Amino acid sequence: MVLNVVLAGDFDCVRRP
């Protein structure tokens, strides 16, 4: 679940630079 959170955060940053 921790990895999921990190992945979600990274995706958010990439989607909203």
UniProtKB/Swiss-Prot annotation:
| Origin superkingdom | Bacteria
Q: What induces it?
A: Expressed in both exponential and stationary phase in rich medium; expression is higher in exponential phase (at protein level).
Q: Miscellaneous notes for this chain?
A: This gene overlaps yriA on the same strand in another reading frame.
Q: What is this protein called?
A: Protein YriB
| Native source organism of the sequence | Escherichia coli (strain K12)
- This protein's encoding gene: yriB
